[in-house]
Amino acid sequence: MPKKPAAKGPFFFFMLEFRRREESRGKSFPGGMDQVMREAGPHWNQLNEAEREVYKDRAKSYKELPKQNYGEKYTAQGIAFSQVEMEKQQLLKKHETIRKTISEMIQTAVLNNALEKLEVFFMSCNYFCKTSTEAFVPAEIALIKYNLELGVLDKLHELINPVRLPLGLAHEALTYSEQTHELPTPPNAMGETDFYTVLQKILSFTDYNSKPHKKLAIMTDAKEVPVIESLLSQLNDDVKLEYQFLVIPLGEFFFHLKRATEKYGLDICTFPTKTVADILLKKDAYEYTSGIACDFHEKLGNQRFCALSKVVRWSYIISDNCCLDLSIDLIAGRHLPSNADTTLCSDLYETTSKTNQSQSDGMSFVSSSELTHFTLPKIQKVQSKSAFRSVEDKNGSVIYSSRTVPKKDVKTETTEPHAPINPFYMVDGNDSVYAPSYPTKSNGTRPGTSYNPFSRQKKLDEVREPHGLDVKGKGRGTLLVTANNSFSSMLKGAGRGSGLFAGLSSVGSNSSVRLSDDEN
């Protein structure tokens, strides 16, 4: 059975009022009521008896309520259902705000025909440890300004020195640092100690004052969203100001941006769900790229966990997937690593109209949009020589088809797929052999056959000669033989039955012998 909730005294109602007052000022309590209790305690101790009397009256009125089922209910963990529902609604509202913000950004850029000029900010943060109140102690931040047309426009990198760590977390911070970013922990940490200076650099870099009526949208990896939110909240609390930021998962923005760019160059959807964008970001094809990290991590050889390297790699992934749709020339060092070969990308832009090879109009015949390497590239595939690829298109590419019949080589086909090898065929009165009938050509051979020097069929046909005698039988016990010496010698090498007739030399050439198994 769950533990019965504690009685609600005056301090409980003071905590509720304290929480509402602080949240109206923009402060959040990720630690829940435990965090509210710790922060409200010092304020409660400063109240005199007259000020506490208000909350005592509220507690007394609550106890006098009828003890029926319409009172406050709690979960098995002792959390009020009203609080759970409130947090759920806040999360849904936040997701709706993120979706609406992304949609407005992209739609506005599309309507102004300036999608490639849309500027966004990518941010990453390394931390030393995580406290019991879900707060992260920052160690390093990195921020870049990016658009599709020019790639990485500007960079901001800053190491942060928190001076001291929360009590009891020094070992945890040291272990986490050694496993990831390898930055020295306090008291040996490097970087800026004044949070106000860090905040001012962020505001100046993002030109926050030019858009005071809106929340500043910052993109980051989905796993880093709580870290960035904690950092920005700490910066606001330290300077006692309320700057509005909206932290957006990068995969969500990447998905909607790709869907928008596809409409310019493709007639199909290659990003059906957000999962595709998340997989590409998680794959991180440029993870070990050198020359894009900060000086400290470059010297250390740990570019992978550098915050600056992360945000630059994210920009490379988005450029690699979206710029070609808009026929944007990729710039090495901004869209892709500085040592990347962009000549192939340049060749892919030189497209040809599918309707007229000589006079390209530069427009897709399906969507009336500019052609890209996805619609009709000039670089064609080398045709395969495989026997199983027999359906070819005009561009030289090969299409696999399960209905395609492989071409046969006549020389390798067997000579007698249906040829009988039993020499005991019966002969009728018209000297015709009862054998399966096959369609023959004018030269007497069956279609699809060729001469095989190792076949016994010719010799067996000679054994069955001649056909002008009145010899009948059931075939299995009947064999026509003559006294012809050449035929006897031929019969000896014919296989079965040769031993029965090797000594029959007295039979004339005009006579015949009938041997039958059913003879009485």
UniProtKB/Swiss-Prot annotation:
Recorded name of the encoding gene: mael
Biased composition (Polar residues): 439-455
Gene Ontology molecular function terms on file: sequence-specific DNA binding
CDD domains given in the database record: HMG-box_MAEL
Protein name listed in UniProt: Protein maelstrom homolog
Function: Plays a central role during gametogenesis by repressing transposable elements and preventing their mobilization, which is essential for the germline integrity. Probably acts via the piRNA metabolic process, which mediates the repression of transposable elements during meiosis by forming complexes composed of piRNAs and Piwi proteins and governs the repression of transposons.
Keyword Transit peptide: no
InterPro entries linked to this entry: HMG_box_dom, HMG_box_dom_sf, Maelstrom, Protein_maelstrom
Positions of the DNA-binding region: 4-75
